[in-house]
A protein has these predicted regions:
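Extracellular interaction modules
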Residues: 1
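Terminal-appendage/accessory-domain detector
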Residues: 4-18, 25-238
């Protein structure tokens, strides 16, 4: 998976959305359009990608996507690791002074996370690090926060991070996977730390990331602060 983690990995969705907006604006200005882009024989979308089957939409076109967009607010990390990051940060006060006493860290997640962001071994760049579930959790447990600086080479050189990664056991909970794929569309993760003396932390689990539509009330103040902070470096805000 590491060869897929470079600085351009996050461009695809933004580029596709920009192109969609461009086409929408052209349409509103009277662009004639191409009515057989989907249905044209041989070279149409349906023939090329769907083996001739027509494109079917699961819901009417409208505002569903905008109303249910998931904001990446609390932590700069791959979407599937967002709830795990929140679990780790919550556990930081119980763990930060006992790092040398840790026997293992158990991570419970869903199958998409297992396939996409569970990575063992070296992480060669910042893009690989923010796409590694174990790295994100290790930083949260050790430092109690995760920022863009957490992925830089100097920060990643802290030996405690890889040492803690090596102590992690990741397993799938099929209920989490079912709820991820099903109507709930949740992003469930859980973290629990076990110590050498036999004691353990509570198992902390979070089902929906803070940027999910179901957590809008607590997310909006954070989103406002993030927007203000990012924009203030480019424009003067009164």
């Amino acid at each position: 998976m590491l060869f897929r983690s470079g600085p351009r990995k996050s461009w695809a969705s933004g580029d596709a959305t920009a192109r969609a907006m461009q086409l929408a604006l052209l349409t509103m200005r009277g662009e004639m359009g191409y009515p057989t882009a989907l249905s044209a024989k041989t070279w149409g979308f349906s023939d090329v990608l769907y083996n001739g089957r027509p494109l079917k939409v699961t819901r009417p076109y409208g505002s569903h996507v905008i109303e249910n967009v998931q904001f990446k607010i609390a932590y700069p990390a791959q979407r599937h690791s967002q709830t795990a990051a929140e679990c780790a940060v919550r556990l930081n006060p119980l763990v930060k002074d006992r790092l040398d006493d840790i026997a293992r860290v158990e991570l419970t997640t869903h199958k998409p996370a297992l396939l996409k962001i569970v990575v063992d071994g070296p992480l060669p760049n910042f893009a690989a690090r923010d796409h590694c579930l174990q790295y994100v959790v290790a930083v949260g447990l050790i430092f109690g926060d995760i920022t863009t600086a957490s992925y830089e080479d100097g920060f990643a050189a802290d030996p405690r991070i890889d040492r803690l990664r090596a102590q992690m056991v990741v397993r799938e909970d099929r209920t989490y996977t079912r709820d991820y794929d099903g109507p709930r569309q949740s992003n469930h993760n859980a973290v629990q730390v076990f110590f050498k003396d036999g004691s353990r932390t509570p198992k902390v689990d979070v089902e929906f990331l803070i940027g999910d539509a179901r957590r809008r009330k607590e997310a909006m103040p954070l989103l406002d602060r993030k927007s203000t902070r990012l924009n203030s470096s480019h424009v003067a805000l009164s």
